[in-house]
Curated annotation (Swiss-Prot):
The name this protein goes by in its record: Glutathione S-transferase kappa 1
Gene3D superfamilies in the record: Glutaredoxin (3.40.30.10)
Subcellular locations according to the entry: Mitochondrion matrix
Modified residues (N6-succinyllysine): K36, K49, K68, K74, K93, K116, K144, K158, K167, K177, K193
Entry function: Glutathione S-transferase that catalyzes the conjugation of glutathione to exogenous and endogenous compounds.
Organism per entry: Rattus norvegicus (Rat)
Pfam families noted in UniProt: DSBA
Amino-acid positions noted as binding glutathione in the UniProt annotation, renumbered to this chain: S16, P17, Y18, N53, L183, S200, D201
């Protein structure tokens, strides 16, 4: 038997486009590196409040930079993202509380669907400029991910329960305890040590810490399979 897989925790919120990039890279490398990836839906607003930080898009110059950067990142990471037309009005102001509670419920009851449902919620915001705050739209994302309608409705009914609310607060709090000040935050547990890395552009450093090979955001072996 080889060495046990290193555990990586990925804290993310579907409001964050950079979380999507980090998510896709780690989902690709989980099949190439000796790692166990734990997806941990968290609430960006809670992390910002705890750390005293604010989202990059809320800083005017950073917001303008993001508009120019995302089309380039789309090509580099091969993730079908584009900036929503009214991101601040439609998505930032409405927030993602219900969507993240839904993902929390998925993680608790049907964790094998968490990757696919998370991806579909990102696709709605960051690829098709669609809403994820209304119940029917959350259901649509779950169904598109392959979840049965009855199960999706069951999980949607759970988002108002204290159990799910508490779990999301707990996960967000765990990220804060690690020192998170934004998302995505990746926590690597390596040889008894814990490393907290921020952003989707720390993957080469992560590979170094893991003793693994970094082959870019779209590894050649993945291209060969595709």
């Amino acid at each position: 038997m080889g060495p046990a897989p290193r555990v990586l925790e990925l804290f993310y919120d579907v409001l964050s486009p950079y979380s999507w990039l980090g998510f896709e890279v780690l989902c690709r490398y989980q099949h190439l590196w000796n790692i166990k990836l734990k997806l941990r839906p968290a609430l960006l607003a809670g992390i910002m409040k705890d750390s005293g930080n604010q989202p990059p898009a809320m800083v005017p110059h950073k917001g303008q930079y993001i508009l120019k950067e995302i089309p380039l990142l789309k090509q580099l990471f091969q993730v079908p993202m584009s900036v929503p037309k009214d991101f601040f009005g439609e998505h930032v102001k409405k927030g993602t509380v219900n969507a993240m509670r839904f993902l929390t419920a998925v993680s608790m009851e049907q964790p094998e669907m968490l990757e696919k449902v998370s991806r579909e919620l990102w696709m709605r915001i960051w690829s098709r400029d669609e809403d994820i705050t209304e119940s029917q739209n959350i259901l649509s994302a779950a169904e598109k991910a392959g979840m049965a309608t009855a199960q999706a409705q069951h999980l949607l009914n759970k988002i108002s329960t204290e159990l799910v609310k508490s779990k999301l607060r707990e996960t967000t709090g765990a990220a804060c305890k690690y020192g998170a000040f934004g998302l995505p935050t990746t926590v690597a547990h390596v040889d008894g040590k814990t490393y907290m890395l921020f952003g989707s552009d720390r993957m080469e450093l992560l590979a170094y810490l893991l003793g693994e090979k970094w082959m870019g955001p779209v590894p050649p072996t993945l291209n060969a399979r595709l």
